[in-house]
Amino acid sequence: MAVAAPRKTEYEAIIGLETHCQLNTASKIFCHCSTKFDSDPNSNVCPVCLGYPGVLPVLNEKVLESAVKMGLALKAKISPYSKFDRKQYFYPDLPKNYQISQFDLPIVEHGHLEIEIADKPSDPPVKKTIGVTRLHMEEDAGKLVHAGSDRLAGSTYSKVDFNRTGIPLLEIVSEPDIRSGKEAAEYAQELRRLVRYLGIGDGNMQEGSLRCDVNISIRPVGQEEFGTKVEIKNMNSFSAIQKAIDYEIERQIKAVETGEPIYQETRLWDESSQRTFSMRKKEGSSDYRYFPEPDLPPIEVTPAQLEKWAAELPETPAQKRERYETEYGLSSYDTRVLTDDRDVAEYFEAAVAAGADPKQVTNWVTQDIAAHLNKNVGLTIVELPLKATQLAELVNLIHDGTISGKIAKEILPELLEQGGSPKAIVESRGLTQISDTGALEAMVDEVLAANPEKVEQFRAGKTKLQGFFVGQLMKKTSGRADPKLLNQILAQKLRG
C-alpha cells in the first residue's frame, strides 16, 4: 500500500468569522411589526419594512441597548456617536434595494472573546483570545422559498416571505485570529452563550437566529502575507462550521501544492456531500456604494445610558467558569458543562444556595438530570418537576446519613417526573438508612452464619467474597443499610 509523501511545506489557516445574531425584541428594528417566528408568510409587514415611498424608519431603542450590552460583554469600546448607512445591492428578498446597516462608524469596536479549547472533554482547556474587530446593527432581509430546489439555481420558481425583513441583527466581525475549525466552532458557541446569558437572543442556528460566514485563507507557516481569501456560507450548526473549515483548509492546501489557482469567491457548504462548492465571485465593500442613511439621525449613547446598561449586565459564562473553579473547586470540564446553558447554571447555584454540597450537586446535575433531559427531548431544566431546592434536600439526606445513595437513585425517577419533597417520600415509605450499630451487627451475624463455607474461603484468602456478603446484606435490608458502617462491621467480623 502506497504511503502519501509528507508535505514539504507546513501551512496555517487564517480564519475570521462574521456572525449575524438575530435579536429577540418584540418589534422590528425600524417599525412596530412583530418579530414572531413561524407566522404566516407576509403577515408581519408594513409600509416601513416593505420600503414604500414616503415612510420613515424609527430606531427601536432596545436594539441599541442590546448592541451596547453585547459590546460591553466583549470588553469593547462603545462609540458615543455612530450612524446608519445604506448598503445598496439588488436581491429579490430586499424590497428597498438597500439594507440599512452601519459602515464606517459602528456602534462597537476593538473587543475580544476568550475561548477554551480541549482535545478531550476531560483534558484541561487551553485558553485563547480572539479579537473582535467590530459589532454593528443592521436589518435582516426577507426569506426566499424555492420550489423544486433548496437554492435559487435549479428552482422552477421562488416565493418571497418578507416577515424577516427588518428583524434586528447584530453583526459581529472577528479578527483573523482563528486557526482551525475547532477554534471557529468554539468561538461561535461562546458567542451564542453570551447572547443567551445577556437575554438578547436565542441563538438557534437551525432557525437562522445565529448565522456564521467564514473567511478563510492559507499561507506557509512563517509567511506574513495572507493568501487569497475565500468566504464560506450555508452552515447551520457548529459541527458544520468545523467540518466546512477543515474541508476548505485541505482543499486550498491541495490547490496550492498542485498549482491550481485559488479564487476570491463565495462558496457554499453542502452537508450531504461534506464539501464546499463555488457560488459566486466575492464582492468587495465598494460594490455596495455605502452612504449615510438620510432618514435616520446620528446615534448617541449617553453616559447615563452606558452606566445603566453596564449595571444590568449578568455574570458571563467565562466569569462563572472561573468562579466555580475557585469558589467550589470544580473541574474545568464540570464548569464548562454547568455554564453552557444559563438556566442550568442558575439551577446549580440555587441548589448550592439551599445548602447542598457543590460537588455533589454537580454530579447529580451533569449526570442523572442531564440524562433525563436528553431522554425527554424538548424538556428544559426550568420545566423540570424536581426543583433546585428539592435536589438540595435529596443531596443533604445522603450527606447526613438519612438515606444511602442507592435509595436516592431509586426515588429519583419519581422526583424527576413528579417533583415533591424527597424527605417526605423517604419518611412515608420507611426508606431511612439503617445506621444502628447493634441492628447491623445482628444482621451481619445472621448472614455469616448462613454461609459458613464462604466465610472459610474468605479467611483462606478469597477476599473478593466480601462483595458477596455486602450484596446479601443490602438485599436483606432492602438497600437501607449505611454502606460505610456496614462495611466496617462486616470487615471486623470476617477477620474473626
Curated annotation (Swiss-Prot):
The keyword ATP-binding applies. GO terms for biological process: glutaminyl-tRNAGln biosynthesis via transamidation; translation. SMART domains: GatB_Yqey. SUPFAM superfamilies: GatB/YqeY motif, Glutamine synthetase/guanido kinase. Belongs to the GatB/GatE family. GatB subfamily. PANTHER family: GLUTAMYL-TRNA GLN AMIDOTRANSFERASE SUBUNIT B MITOCHONDRIAL AND PROKARYOTIC PET112-RELATED (PTHR11659), GLUTAMYL-TRNA(GLN) AMIDOTRANSFERASE SUBUNIT B, MITOCHONDRIAL (PTHR11659:SF0). NCBIfam families: gatB (TIGR00133), PRK05477.1-2 (NF004012), PRK05477.1-4 (NF004014), PRK05477.1-5 (NF004015). This is Aspartyl/glutamyl-tRNA(Asn/Gln) amidotransferase subunit B. It comes from Picosynechococcus sp. (strain ATCC 27264 / PCC 7002 / PR-6) (Agmenellum quadruplicatum). The gene is gatB.
